[in-house]
Amino acid sequence: MARNTAINRYRNIGICAHVDAGKTTTTERILFYTGLSHKMGEVHDGAATTDWMVQEQERGITITSAAITTFWEGSRRQYDKYRVNVIDTPGHVDFTIEVERSLRVLDGAVVVFCGTSGVEPQSETVWRQANKYGVPRIVYVNKMDRQGANFLRVVGQIKNRLGHTPVPIQIAIGAEENFEGQVDLIKMKAIYWNDDDKGTTYREEEIPAELVDLANEWRSNMVEAAAEASEELMNKYLEEGDLSAEDIKAGLRARTLASEIVPAVCGSSFKNKGVPLVLDAVIDFLPAPTEIPAIKGIHPDLADKPKEQMEESDYDERHADDNEPFSALAFKIATDPFVGTLTFVRVYSGVLESGQSVINSVKGKKERVGRMVQMHANQRDEIKEVRAGDIAALIGMKDVTTGETLCDPDKPIILERMDFPEPVISVAVEPKTKADQEKMGIALGKLAQEDPSFRVKTDEETGQTIISGMGELHLDILVDRMKREFNVEANIGKPQVSYRETITKDSVEIEGKFVRQSGGRGQFGHCWIRFSAPDVDDKGNITEGLVFTNEVVGGVVPKEYIPAIQKGIEEQMKNGVVAGYPLIGLKATVFDGSYHDVDSNEMAFKIAASMATKQLAQKGGGKVLEPIMKVEVVTPEDYMGDVMGDLNRRRGLIQGMEDSVSGKVIRAEVPLGEMFGYATDVRSMSQGRASYSMEFSKYAEAPSNIVEALVKKQG
């Protein structure tokens, strides 16, 4: 079967933003204008098409990234048909994992900002994540009809706060209730939207006299930005003093794909003024799958090789080409009440037909692909095949987790994995009735499979089930989903902070010896280990996990016992050395020891290594670390003193303050343990007028009174 749409006419894009910048409404309008949805859903009446989980509709925030396939021929039917796969991403800090995993599989992004509040904390997080994956993007400043909206002020904030170069290709005509449309700086025409067809079409007129000078100023800024794309364009510009519309688009496109600039447009999705031009900008400036670098991967045999030891020759590439071996990345798992598990994949290369088998190269397991569907929010169309560049959902996968690779069994590859943050908050859950115990286990297992930033474990001492996640809202919603989707009522304990431990000494040599010899077969394990504190980067982030090396010479400890020593260290790291919390990172080198011909075995060496690791509390300068959150509070000036005093009482460090449309923005770093229930406190302090957001920043040493309490608790 041939391709319906040439791959150079694919656009895989995400719509990212801060909560309430109007992202879901923008996605709704995209569905409407691309002809998929005949009734526009409004978020505030709980009817938006992409917000298809019950809680999303109730809370008015987007939680899961729904992937939608649409087609676009241009606001003036000026293009051949393009296939646009849109992923709607959540903007709430507790769901950054959803944003991260969507950005991983996208080729370009539309970042939506509110015309009034501009660059908000979460926008910075999303921007950093897009930088991390090198995602080219365009900016859409929405809500231009709102009080205090100002397009060029937001453009300035993007430059100053995000350190990127925005290039407006429009300016706004009017603002707030007088917002009428845009000046198209490429055509130098004023654009006014037709209310009769809900802003599907527009008329072009001359630019209003009072905006001509401003339009000329920003046009020359745009033309210069385009000219800098190449020597050829620069020479043309210097000779002729201007560039044609084609040259401007080509220059801006080249620089956007290189992530040097960000084209900026404005509008009001709610008032139906501007979204078709956002779609035009997606076609004009964002990349096709063939215009981004080929994805890299490694052969499954090299899966255990440490990243720092990898050589260029260890990597393999997959290009966006139907003739290459099939490879795809599972970026989301969702449970559907009718068909079971949906595995959302981004296909990077090759072709897959339903009924064929693929291999999950991470687990080494074969999977048969039953049915395949293309999603339109929560409706689905069955398809017979997927090709390079496609985003689709596979039905019938038995054992696939987010971030794993599905590929051709004859040409296996493990594509670059996603990094998932460690949870920072835990609560105990127990079913309200004994009968729900088993159901709760199944429900939590399914939710953990869908969301890698959510963990479930059983506390060995208390037998309680502990769930961990990225914030209070994250866990609230998962407990809520358990109730709605699996009919499991649960009681929730008090939130617990995920403390960590580390050591501070840079080189300490410790002996571990485990000997039991009393007639018959005994136990003998003896090793010397040099422990060092983990590496810390400029921002205070600690290298996680164990970096283990073997420097034993002369066979004083036989080779077959070395993995047992590593295992013993790793197991003790999980249980901590000071107060029972996991060691965040450690460097360990085994360099000496001894063995017994008869009594030595793996278990003895594992215990010896564990005993050596335990001594780090005293000998290695063991410390307890607490998670520190980056907190941003937006408050009217009247309540600023109270808010700051309260943050100080919570052991917060004020990092800075600035003015915003809604008052003052206070930025601080506060220990997570002091932030429980903050939502209620900050509301009562400000009579409901202050809002805040927080995200994980780093781990830092906990004060001695907290450590004492934790050690006491451990008994």
UniProtKB/Swiss-Prot annotation:
Q: Which domain of life is it from?
A: Bacteria
Signal peptide boundaries: none
Q: Which SUPFAM superfamilies match?
A: EF-G C-terminal domain-like, P-loop containing nucleoside triphosphate hydrolases, Ribosomal protein S5 domain 2-like, Translation proteins
Organism in which the protein naturally occurs: Ectopseudomonas mendocina (strain ymp) (Pseudomonas mendocina)
- Function, as annotated: Catalyzes the GTP-dependent ribosomal translocation step during translation elongation. During this step, the ribosome changes from the pre-translocational (PRE) to the post-translocational (POST) state as the newly formed A-site-bound peptidyl-tRNA and P-site-bound deacylated tRNA move to the P and E sites, respectively. Catalyzes the coordinated movement of the two tRNA molecules, the mRNA and conformational changes in the ribosome.
Task: Provide the residue positions that the database annotates as binding GTP.
Answer: 17-24, 88-92, 142-145
- Locate the tr-type G domain: which residues? 8-290
Q: What is this protein called?
A: Elongation factor G
Q: Where in the cell is it found?
A: Cytoplasm
Provide an example Pfam family for this protein: EFG_C
**Could you say which protein family the record assigns here?**
Belongs to the TRAFAC class translation factor GTPase superfamily. Classic translation factor GTPase family. EF-G/EF-2 subfamily.
* GO CC aspect terms: cytoplasm
- Provide the primary localization: cytoplasm
**Does the keyword field hold Cell division?**
no
One example GO MF annotation = translation elongation factor activity
Gene Ontology biological process terms, A to Z: ribosome disassembly
